Design a protein with these regions (language model features):
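Short, hydrophobic beta-strand segments that form beta-sheet elements in well-ordered domains
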Residues: 70-75, 138-141, 280
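A charged, amphipathic alpha-helical module
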Residues: 2-70, 186-289
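Short, acidic/turn-prone active-site loops that include or flank metal/cofactor-
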Residues: 95-101, 164-169
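Structural signal for conserved beta-strand scaffold positions within catalytic alpha/beta enzyme cores
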Residues: 74, 93, 162-164
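Short, charged, surface-exposed secondary-structure boundary motifs
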Residues: 100-110, 170-176
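Acidic/His-rich segments in extracytoplasmic proteins that coordinate ligands and/or metal ions
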Residues: 123-187
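Redox- and metal-dependent alpha/beta enzyme cores, enriched for Fe-S-associated oxidoreductases
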Residues: 66, 78, 83-97, 104-105, ...
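Glycine-rich, highly charged phosphate/nucleotide-binding loops
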Residues: 112-127
């Protein structure tokens, strides 16, 4: 595994505090994921991504910036990655999935604010996550009052752009959201220095749709009994989808699905046939939560 400490230092990170977070993740990951029985071989790639989560992909983002490109940090799922990619940028999802970052958020947010928001702000202010140090622009959305306030605070420390998400689904709300996307396009073009063309947008739409199709294929394999991949591993892959290179991610997910579909044909699975299932809805659950 490469040594990324100099990169972290160059990003202005608190390396000593970051090491405290890095010290607990390997044991947690082994207990929750690696010790599962009969895991698919195709999970090796995704395990490697997490094993070097603050190294390989951040280094790619840094290299992209050194080559003159721009990186956009996005929260939630409402920011259209297609526009960012069409403008020559890279979109990377930012999560608030660790309690480790909550105290940092509590220095500027009320204690009764939800942990997701506090962790998202804390990850930036604590300087312990490279994904929160790299972006040229952070793009938030108005899904709740807590986030609205959080973006005001984040804007004091980093460039922030907020998309105004309508609260209803009326025609006027759809039109308002369409206008928000057009305004975002203008902002992305301004930051990136590149115009979005019909051709570049066509390519980026196909790229992101291929990623979505790969995820849909993965989820469809879990309809079978016995299930060929655990829910925990499926959640892990869905999180990696937010920040991995979209073309590489789609290729590796499809390769995994080839293996899973072969297991289905053989009647093999990671759990007994008709094993009980738990339905989880809402926001994606991020490692280590």
């Amino acid at each position: 595994m490469a040594d990324y400490r100099q990169m972290w230092i160059d990003l202005g990170m608190d390396v000593e505090k970051h090491d405290m977070l890095g010290a607990v993740l390997p044991d947690m990951f082994q207990q929750v994921y690696l010790l599962q029985d009969q895991r698919p071989q195709g999970m090796n790639y995704f395990d490697a991504v997490v094993a070097d989560i603050h190294g390989i992909r951040p280094a790619e983002l840094v290299q992209h910036r050194q080559n003159g490109g721009k990186v956009f940090g996005t929260f939630c799922v409402y920011v259209p990655d297609e526009i960012i990619i069409a403008a020559g940028g890279i979109a990377t999802g930012l999560c608030g999935g660790s309690q480790f970052w909550v105290p940092g958020g509590e220095t500027v947010l009320p204690l009764n604010t939800c942990s997701l928001i506090k962790a998202s702000i804390g990850a930036r202010l604590d300087k312990t996550c490279p994904f929160f140090r790299i972006p040229d622009l952070y793009i938030g959305e108005t899904t709740c009052d807590g986030k609205k306030k959080a973006w005001e605070i984040l804007a004091q420390d980093a460039p922030v752009y907020v998309m105004d998400l309508p609260q209803m689904k009326r025609r006027q709300d759809v039109e308002a959201w369409e206008n928000e996307i057009k305004l975002l396009l203008q902002k992305v073009e301004e930051v990136s220095g590149h115009k979005v063309t019909p051709e570049s947008l066509d390519r980026s739409i196909k790229l992101i749709n291929n990623k979505r199709k790969a995820l849909a294929r993965l989820y469809n394999t879990r309809k079978n009994s016995p299930v060929p991949i655990s829910g925990k591993d499926a959640l892990l892959i869905s999180q990696i989808a937010f920040y991995d290179d979209p073309e590489r991610f789609a290729n590796m997910t499809n390769a995994l699905c080839d293996e899973l579909e072969a297991s289905v044909q053989k009647g093999e699975g990671v759990l007994p046939k008709n094993a009980p299932r738990i339905l989880i809805t809402g926001t994606p659950m991020a490692v280590p939560n």
